[in-house]
Amino acid sequence: MKAVLLLLYALGIAAAVPTTFLSDHSNPTSATLPTLEDATVPTVPAEAAADIEKHPNHKAEKPSALNSEEEAHEQSTEQDKTYSFEVDLKDEEDGDGDLSVDPTERTLDLQEGTSEPQQKRLPENADFPATVSTPFVDSDQPANITKGEESQEQPVSDSHQQQDESGKQTQDSMTEESHKQDPGIPNEEKEEEEDPEDVGAPSDNQEEEKEPPEEQPTSKWEGNGDQSEDILQESSQPTQISKTKNDFEQGSQGQEGDSNAEGEDKAAGSKEHLPHTEWQGQEGRAGLDAIGNRKDTDEEKAVSTEPTDAAVVPRNHGASDNGGGDDSKHGASDDYFIPSQEFLEAERMHSLSYYLKYGEETPDESENRSEAGDNQGAKKAESSPNAEPSDEGNSRGHSADSCMNFQCKRGHTCKTDQHGKPHCVCQDPETCPPAKILDQACGTDNQTYASSCHLFATKCMLEGTKKGHQLQLDYFGACKSIPACTDFEVAQFPLRMRDWLKNILMQLYEPNPKHGGYLNEKQRSKVKKIYLDEKRLLAGDHPIELLLRDFKKNYHMYVYPVHWQFNELDQHPADRILTHSELAPLRASLVPMEHCITRFFEECDPNKDKHITLKEWGHCFGIKEEDIDENLLF
C-alpha cells in the first residue's frame, strides 16, 4: 500500500513541476523554444555524463531527461487540471510521503552537489528567477549556477526553460531511485540528513520574486505555500543550528560557507547511512543537542545575528514569509560563495575544534559553576558560626589591652567587666603554667604545692577564712620533716643569721663572672671595708660561742649586711616594710640550715601585725637602734 501511495505522490509532483516553472510564462512562444534548445541541450547531457561516471546509481537519469523533454509541452497545456489533482494527493499523503522520499532526494541532491567541487562567486547583479518549490530543487542548483556564469546576459525566459528541463529530469530520476533505497532508515536520521540549503536564502532580486506569484492562479498559490511550509519544517532546524554555531565563530564569512560545508559532510553521511551519532561527530554540532529548547533559541539567534548588508535578507525569512511561496526556497548557494574543497576541509576542522572547545566544555563549566556556588555557600555557612568566635576574640583582645597596665596581687588575675573596666579576680590553679619538680613550694600549712602560683591561687580562693589568712609560702621545694625549734635554738638563730649575711656580701664582692655587676658603687664601697679588714671572721662552721664573741668584737662589720638584706627583700613593694611574702625567699634559703626560721620571724614581729619594719628587723639581729639608718638602704 505504501508503494502505491509513494508512486502516486511522485507522479503528482512530476505533473506539478511545469506549472511552477512556467509561472511567469504560462504560454511558451516559438521565440523562447529555439533559445532553450541552443542553451540547455549541450549542458545537461554533459553534466549528466559526468555525474554518471562518478555515481553509478544515476544510470537511469539520461533516458529520463529525454522523456521529460518530449512531455514538456503536453503537460504545460494541462497545468490547471493536473495541479488540482496534485493538491489532493498532497493533502492525503502529507504526513507519510515527505519523510519516505526524503532520503532518496538527499542522496541524489548531495551526490550531484559534490560533482563540482569548485565554483566561482555568483555576481550580485545576476538576474535569475527563483527555482522550483519542490524538495528536489537543490540537486540542480550547482548546474544552474554554472550555467548562469557562462551566460549571464541571456533572457529571463531562457533560464526559466533551462530550470524546467532540469527539474523534470531530476523528478524522473528520483522516482526510479526511491525504490532502490533502504526503507528501514529511521525517520530521525532522515530529518537530520536534510540539506540545510533548502531553507530560504538571501536574494538580490526581491522585487522580481514577488511578481510570479501574482500571475499564478489562487489554487496554485495555496498549494505551493503548503509545500513550502512542509519543506521548511523539516529542513529549517539543521540550517539554523549550523548558522547559529558559525555566527559565534566567523560572523558574516562563516555564514557564506556554512551551508556548503554541511552539504559536503552530509553527502558522505547519506551515502554510508551513518548513525545519528556519527553524523554529529562529522559536523561537530553535538554540543547543541543537549539544549532542550533549541528550536526557539536557534530561531531567535538566527534572526538576531543577521548581516547588516542591505542586499542580504535573513536566511530564515522563507519560513516566516508565507507570501514568498516559490521564491522563498532558493538554495543558499544562489547568492553565496561556493568554496573550494580545501576551504570546506578547513571549515569542517574549525567547526570540530569549536565543538571540542565549547560544546564539551559547557558541562564542565556548569559543573564548575555549581561547585563554585556550593563552595561559596559552604564558606558563608562556615563564616556565620565563626562570627561569634571572632567577636569573642575581639573582646579578648580588648580585655588584654585594658589589663596590660593593670596589676594584681599574686594569686589574682585581671579581667574586664561588661563595661570594659579591668578588675582582679582569683586565679584558677589549673590555669597556672606547667611546673617542674624544682618549682615545688611548701606552705606554712606544711603542704607541698606544685608551684608558688598554685599556692597563691589556693590562698586567694581561701580568702575570708582563717586558713586562707594564715597560709603563706614557707619555702621552695617539697615540705620536709623539720623538728621543733627549741628556745635555745631560737636564741642562737640571730648569731648564725648575721654571719651568713656577711659571708654572702663577701662572695658578691669578690671578682666573679657570675656575680659581676650585682653590687652598685655605694654597696661595693661599704663591703670593701669589711672585705679588707684583717679581723674579719672567715666563713665556716663555727660554734655559737665563736660567733657571739666575733659579733661583740667586730660589731661594725655586721651593721651594713643587716641593712643590705632588708633592702634586698623589700621589693614588692619597696615601702620599707617586709611582708610575709617578701620574707619567703629568705625563708626558703635558710630552711636547709635552720629549722627555726619560722619561729624566728614570728619573734621579729612583736606587735603581730604581719609586717616587719626596719627597726623591728634591726632589733631581731641585735643592731642598736641608733645604728639603724634608712640611708644605708641603697
UniProtKB/Swiss-Prot annotation:
A GO cellular-component term linked to this record: extracellular space
Bias-annotated ranges (Basic and acidic residues): 51-62, 73-83, 263-276, 292-303, 366-382
Glycosylation sites: N144, N368, N446
Family: Belongs to the SPARC family.
A Gene Ontology biological process term: regulation of synapse organization
Gene3D superfamilies: 3.30.60.30, EF-hand (1.10.238.10)
Compartment(s) of residence: Secreted, Extracellular space, Extracellular matrix
Full protein name: SPARC-like protein 1
Location of Phosphoserine modifications: S68, S76, S84, S151, S159, S259, S333, S340, S370, S390
Binding site for Ca(2+): D605, N607, D609, H611, E616
